[in-house]
């Protein structure tokens, strides 16, 4: 018998020329089976049975050796981008331990500033210059490397990629400050090392350009943005306070100048008076200029009491503005924490919605699970290796019933070897160790054998693994072991294997093939189960996301509590109003409401129309109509009884037809009025008299 190629994990299509599907990590690969064994290009199928894109990689390792170089380059590119992004975050957006580096840089800058200050003192000038020169070397190296790394790491942002993007990043204000400080430091070091006294004295002032290094500590400009936002938010109040304070300063300086210009030489000009007014109204008070006359003192005291209050207003406005802005930022951070739970909740809700079996047109979620589910390729190779080792190096198709020597038959129990075309060989003792791939493989190959051989095998009886090695001809004195928990779990109805391998010698090879393994686990059983498991996982994730989102909705402060209470109060008022409208629609409005509506803009016709719409108004209308009908029936019955008592047709015309009360029939109008009834009665009496005369 020729050795057939090993079969892969089939999804159980019909035999013949039908398409064949192969399962790889719960992702089917379907190919057309040709006449010579099939060599067409495979098509991957997802959990929904729809073909996946042809360029999508197969899950699991070993998907192809041709793309190994591309995968290595892609992995290297990913590592490069990850490193670039990490460095950019450390330098531009420090968090956690990254602050250690920035604190070290701050200490270097602060030390350089202190040494620059000490270098201007005559007693410490020589020592400070030597230490400052060494520190400047260190600062040049550190800041030069940092500047280059900053420009390189900016490529992780899309707008800073390429040479143009790097140049755009270098034009940022803080990068320009870094470049200016770096150039100034290099110039100072170069002049100091050459010993040029003139150049050193000229460039000594450039050291104070290094004060700009303190500005670079706030790379993101958060403090300047906060100050600008506070000034912009309270710009009207600040402009008003500054305007009134400026007017007070001008008038106070001018009046004091007029009062003191003749008696006091300190106020010889209006500029001297403005200097005195600025120092006095800002509560600094150097004391270099003071008014000497009583008129000047009185004016200075009055304008000081009035002007100081306006000059102090901007400080209070800015202080309260900063406090409100900081509180608002804290609230904003608290609200920003809700974004991720809200996004997770929306994503979980959509995935739960899309995994419903009634919505087969939503396939994106299933493609996602096709890509993350594990592969069975390593498991299949392991099973094949174990089978070869157990079969003595033979392939599964070459395994037959092994001959047992006569002497060994009495010492050892008979070993059952099974054969199944196109599949691996498993003995009953090994059935408990079969994986899902082998079970599906046995099911698919059992379907390919055709219905001619399947109907010959009787339905198998499941046996416990503990008693599988005991043959049918064994001694009856041996008691069979009871089912354990693992055996019951192993032989459930959904995952139960039904072997039909007999320990006795089979009559022929064909009978052994007919008694091959049967497996109830097919792809049709696996896929719905997998989808159900995925949907259950989506339900759990949705509930967890919902709980986390509710936890973030807790109030932040008293203002949030008041807002929640006010929103709840408005909601309650709306519900009460809706309930009152429904009650009015059912019961109707009371007499007090009617009087109120009659006094309003609505006319009586609108009021009656509203009352008739209500359920109670309709019930009252029906009752009035029933009463009117009853009254009319009573009148008709009385009229009919009087006609019967008269006895003759001649006296029918003399009977007076009773008239209906219009008040009773106000809500119900009969199609025949009382005048028509009297006329019809007279016509009836005339016709009867004519008929009697003719007789």
From Swiss-Prot:
One of its GO terms (cellular component) is basal plasma membrane. The chain crosses the membrane at residues 97-118, 130-152, 169-191, 203-223, 236-258, 294-322. Residues 442-452, 464-483 have a biased composition (Polar residues). Residues 591-605 have a biased composition (Basic and acidic residues). Residues 1-96, 153-168, 224-235, 323-695 are cytoplasmic. Residues 1-21, 441-483, 588-608 are annotated as: Disordered. A 1,2-diacyl-sn-glycero-3-phospho-(1D-myo-inositol-4,5-bisphosphate) 1 binds at residues 93, 172, 219-220, 225. It is a multi-pass membrane protein. It holds the Pfam family KCNQ_channel. It is found in: Basal cell membrane. Residues 342-351, 535-549 are annotated as: Interaction with CALM. Residues 546-650 are annotated as: C-terminal assembly domain (tetramerization). Two molecules of phosphatidylinositol-4,5-bisphosphate (PIP2-I and PIP2-II) are essential to activate KCNQ4 channel by inducing the coupling of the voltage-sensing domain (VSD) and the pore-forming domain (PD). Upon channel activation, PIP2-I and PIP2-II disrupt the VSD-calmodulin/CALM interaction, causing the release of CALM from the VSD which triggers the opening of the gate. Calcium suppresses KCNQ4 channel current through calcium-bound CALM C-terminus. Therefore CALM acts as calcium sensor that controls channel activity. One of its GO terms (molecular function) is potassium channel activity. It catalyses: K(+)(in) = K(+)(out). InterPro entries: Ion_trans_dom, K_chnl_volt-dep_KCNQ, K_chnl_volt-dep_KCNQ_C. Expressed in both the inner (IHCs) and the outer hair cells (OHCs) of the cochlea. Reciprocal longitudinal gradients of expression is present in IHCs and OHCs. The strongest expression in IHCs is in the base of the cochlea and in the apex for OHCs. A basal to apical gradient of expression is also present in both type I and type II spiral ganglion cells. Pore-forming subunit of the voltage-gated potassium (Kv) channel involved in the regulation of sensory cells excitability in the cochlea. KCNQ4/Kv7.4 channel is composed of 4 pore-forming subunits assembled as tetramers. Promotes the outflow of potassium ions in the repolarization phase of action potential which plays a role in regulating membrane potential of excitable cells. The channel conducts a slowly activating and deactivating current. Current often shows some inward rectification at positive potentials. Each channel subunit contains six transmembrane segments (S1-S6) with S1-S4 forming one voltage sensing domain (VSD) and S5-S6 contributing to form one quarter of an interlocking pore-forming domain (PD). The CALM binding domains correspond to the first two membrane-proximal helical regions that interact with a single calmodulin/CALM molecule forming a clamp-like structure. CALM N-terminus binds to the second helix in both calcium-free and calcium-bound forms and regulates channel trafficking. CALM C-terminus binds to the first helice in calcium-free form; this interaction is disrupted by calcium binding which regulates channel electrophysiological activity. Belongs to the potassium channel family. KQT (TC 1.A.1.15) subfamily. Kv7.4/KCNQ4 sub-subfamily. PANTHER family: POTASSIUM VOLTAGE-GATED CHANNEL SUBFAMILY KQT MEMBER 4. This is Potassium voltage-gated channel subfamily KQT member 4. It comes from Rattus norvegicus (Rat). The lineage of its organism: Eukaryota, Metazoa, Chordata, Craniata, Vertebrata. The gene is Kcnq4.
């Amino acid at each position: 018998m020729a050795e057939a190629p090993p079969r892969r994990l089939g999804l159980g299509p019909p035999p013949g020329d039908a398409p064949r599907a192969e399962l790889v990590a719960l992702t089917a690969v379907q190919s057309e089976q040709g006449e010579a064994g099939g060599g067409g290009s495979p098509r991957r199928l997802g959990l929904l049975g729809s073909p996946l894109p042809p360029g999508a990689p197969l899950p699991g390792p070993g998907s192809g050796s041709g793309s190994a170089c591309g995968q290595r380059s892609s992995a290297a590119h990913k590592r490069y981008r990850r490193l670039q992004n990490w460095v950019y975050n450390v330098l531009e957006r420090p968090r956690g331990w990254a602050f250690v580096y920035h604190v070290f840089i701050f200490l270097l800058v602060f030390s350089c500033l202190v040494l620059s200050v000490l270098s201007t003192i005559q007693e410490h000038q020589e020592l400070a210059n030597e230490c400052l020169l060494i520190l400047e070397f260190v600062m040049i190296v550190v800041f030069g490397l940092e500047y280059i790394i900053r420009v390189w790491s900016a490529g992780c942002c899309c707008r800073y990629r390429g040479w143009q993007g790097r140049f755009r990043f270098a034009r940022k204000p803080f990068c320009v400050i870094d470049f200016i400080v770096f150039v100034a430091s290099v110039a100072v070091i170069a002049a100091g090392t050459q010993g040029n006294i003139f150049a050193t004295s000229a460039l000594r002032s450039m050291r104070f350009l290094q004060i700009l290094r303190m500005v670079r500590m706030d790379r993101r400009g958060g403090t300047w943005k906060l100050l600008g936002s506070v000034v912009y938010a309270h710009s009207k109040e600040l402009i008003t306070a500054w305007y009134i304070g400026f007017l007070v300063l001008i008038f106070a300086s001018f009046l004091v100048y007029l009062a003191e210009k003749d008696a006091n030489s300190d106020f010889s000009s209006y500029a001297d008076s403005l200097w005195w007014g600025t120092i006095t109204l800002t509560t600094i008070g150097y004391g270099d200029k003071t008014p000497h006359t009583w008129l000047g003192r009185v004016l200075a005291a009055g304008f000081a009491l009035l002007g100081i209050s306006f000059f102090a207003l901007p400080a209070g406005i800015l202080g309260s503005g900063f406090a409100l802005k900081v509180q608002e930022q804290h609230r904003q951070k608290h609200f920003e924490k809700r974004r991720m739970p809200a996004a997770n909740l929306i994503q979980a809700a959509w995935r739960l919605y899309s995994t419903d079996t009634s919505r087969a047109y939503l396939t994106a979620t299933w493609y996602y699970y096709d890509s993350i589910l594990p592969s069975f390729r390593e498991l299949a190779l392991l099973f094949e290796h174990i089978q070869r080792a157990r079969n003595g190096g033979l392939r599964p198709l070459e395994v037959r019933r092994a001959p047992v020597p006569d002497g060994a038959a009495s010492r050892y129990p008979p070993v059952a070897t099974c054969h199944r075309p196109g599949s691996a060989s498993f003995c009953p003792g090994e059935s408990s160790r079969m994986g899902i791939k082998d079970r599906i493989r046995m099911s698919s190959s059992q379907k390919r054998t055709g219905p001619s051989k399947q109907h010959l095998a009787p339905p198998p009886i499941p046996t416990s693994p503990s008693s599988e090695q005991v043959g049918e001809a064994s001694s009856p004195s041996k008691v069979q072991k009871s089912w354990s928990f693992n055996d019951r779990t192993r032989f459930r109805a959904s995952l139960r294997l039904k072997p039909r391998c007999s320990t006795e010698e089979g009559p022929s090879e064909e009978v052994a093939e007919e008694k091959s393994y049967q497996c109830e686990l097919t792809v049709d059983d696996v896929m719905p189960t997998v989808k159900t498991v995925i949907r259950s996982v989506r339900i759990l994730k949705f509930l967890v996301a919902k709980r986390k989102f509710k936890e973030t909705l807790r109030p932040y402060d008293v203002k949030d509590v008041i807002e929640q209470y006010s929103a709840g109060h408005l909601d309650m008022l709306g519900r009460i109003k809706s309930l009152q409208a429904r009650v009015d629609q059912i019961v109707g409005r009371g007499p007090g409401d009617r009087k109120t509506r009659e006094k309003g803009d609505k006319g009586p016709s609108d009021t009656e129309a509203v009352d008739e719409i209500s359920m109670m108004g309709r019930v009252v209308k029906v009752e009035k109509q029933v009463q009117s009908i009853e009254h009319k029936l009573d009148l008709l019955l009385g009229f009919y009884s009087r006609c019967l008592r008269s006895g003759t047709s001649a006296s029918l015309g003399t009977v007076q037809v009773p008239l209906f009360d219009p008040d009773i029939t106000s809500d119900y109008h009969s199609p025949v009025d009382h005048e028509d009834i009297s006329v019809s009665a007279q016509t009836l009496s005339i016709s009867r008299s004519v008929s009697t005369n003719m007789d």
